[in-house]
Amino acid sequence: KDFKDNKNNRFEVADHFNSKFLASGPFWGYPAPNNGRYGDIPYKKPMGYGVLLPSEKRLIEQTLTNAKSVWQLNGVGCVGGQALLGIPIVDNLRKFVSTSIWPFELENSKVVCAEIYPSIFTIEDSEVFKDASQVKTVVNTFFTLDLEGQLDQLMKVPMSLNNEVITHEGWILGAKI
């Protein structure tokens, strides 16, 4: 839950999910001080990925080596918290407008939600905050590609991806294999 005062419960959600695993993790990284508040979230990356835990990195994170793991909740460049907060918001959006999730759902809809990784683009450093510059760059890039009739090409699922990646792991829009 993302609250109006900019507080959220991402660490509580991750702590709950982690409690379902036999090993420590898979979510990791919490803000200090913790004082035992998140007993099932290790501070540092746990051992056991791919054995007792899900894989640490999807194929896309192995391909884009600077991309962070979705399991990292805290620290520079982490995306785990964004994923935990963003997925329910996207799901809620689907109640109000025809929405598809790329690459899992390829049918036509009014809104297409896709995972992005701004670092695959040359970022226009035009804003005070780096995140704002990154979002502005990605939006402008996709807008230009759409005007030029090239966005459809970008949204074609790379042919070299296997079905497991397409249906289970997902992919980052615009990333090349």
Predicted regions and their residues:
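RNase H-like (RuvC/DEDD) metal-dependent nuclease/polynucleotide-processing core
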Residues: 1-177
